[in-house]
Amino acid sequence: VRVGSLIDQMIVSKNVKDNKTGMTAKEQIQAILARVAKLNRRKDTVYENLMDEVAQAGIRLVDFRKIGKKEGKYLEQYFDAEIAPLISPIVVGKRQPFPFLKNKGIYAVVVLEKKNGKEKLGIIPCNSGVFPRLVQVPAEEETYMLAEELILHFISKVFKGYFVKAKSLIRVTRNADIDADALYDEDLDYRDFMEGIIKKRKRLLPVRVE
């Protein structure tokens, strides 16, 4: 929420300094990003330690670098039968508008190239809830792979007729700062008003793309 409000301030009044920190909105954001970088390194270390403990308990979370041909063939068949029919691929070009990306949504994004050399952007929502996120891999240990890893690996099967130049998984975090008091109308039912506020928060500008 705080970062969202600072981004708004940076656009509207970028040279105004905060009376508590003595910093402009841009300077505060830079300080926050420096602190967040340290927190992210700490988060990654904690995650790796937790995954080691889970592995010691006989449960593994893997990607395609850690499986054999037999497991890879099974996952391809699983993708074709259980995931591919349920995904909704989007192609973005000059005539196709960029879609709205949901807050905290996970998306497989690819740069597509046609035979004539023209590029387009391909997007696939990966956590729509229509298929399980954890896919079990046949192995001696209890082994799983994330559905988004599966989608990204086989994404060329979805966008047939294109060459995949680059691909990645992204997640968008949207601004959660909204002034409810400024928007409140006494003639509205308060419950309906708050429902509208919550819906509006989900469509505010992005503050982070991972």
What do the PLM-derived regions correspond to, one by one?
Residues V1-E210:
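N-terminal non-catalytic structural scaffold regions of very large proteins
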